[in-house]
A protein has these predicted regions:
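Noncatalytic alpha-helical scaffold of FAD-dependent oxidoreductases
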Residues: 1-186
Length: 186
């Protein structure tokens, strides 16, 4: 809906999971939750668009139930704070221990299906695994990182990497996607 409404004026469209945001809030000092708790958040950036069209677009999305809540940065400083939440995800994840990281791409329309299928398969195979998903969904790219279950040691989690990778890669390929998407490999 954002791309249809704003076309080239939509310069960023980042998906952030609650798990990713929680890591930032927990591990990065001075981070603040920008809005009510939700399973997913989108950080969108617009160029050369006044506030009114964005406010109207957001109000329409909320009215029709596509969006639960929203925040529009009122200053450059507030925009910087919002972007810091996205930019600090990887750093926040490091504090929690070892991660198994993936950079995948699937057709934009299939991102929800990828998340549902991969999450379910991984949680079935590795109860307690923590999925930290975020990324540039405007072009189908997604950082799909897995953190160890809270009680598991790094070495045990690292040993599961081949099976974790197989599950993620099989799901990506089943949806006509690719791995190492952002970096041009695969």
């Amino acid at each position: 809906a954002a791309k249809n409404s704003f076309d080239a004026q939509l310069t960023a469209f980042e998906l952030i999971s609650e798990a990713a945001l929680e890591l930032v809030l927990k591990n990065i000092p001075d981070s603040q939750r920008p809005t009510a708790i939700s399973p997913w958040y989108v950080l969108a950036e617009f160029s050369h668009v006044g506030a009114a069209p964005i406010e109207n677009w957001l109000a329409t999305r909320i009215e029709c139930g596509e969006v639960a809540d929203g925040v529009i940065a009122q200053s450059a400083a507030q925009a910087k704070q919002l972007w810091a939440l996205r930019e600090n995800i990887s750093e926040a994840q490091k504090v929690e221990g070892v991660s198994i990281k993936h950079d995948v791409a699937v057709p934009v329309s299939r991102i929800p299906e990828f998340l549902a299928r991969a999450d379910a398969a991984l949680l079935n195979a590795f109860p307690g695994i923590r999925v930290v998903a975020f990324g540039h969904v405007g072009d189908g790219n997604l950082h799909y990182n897995l953190s160890q279950p809270d009680a598991q040691k790094n070495t045990a989690f690292i040993a599961s990497q081949p099976e974790v990778n197989r599950i993620v890669h099989d799901t990506v390929h089943a949806l006509n996607g690719s791995i190492s998407a952002e970096h041009g490999i695969g």
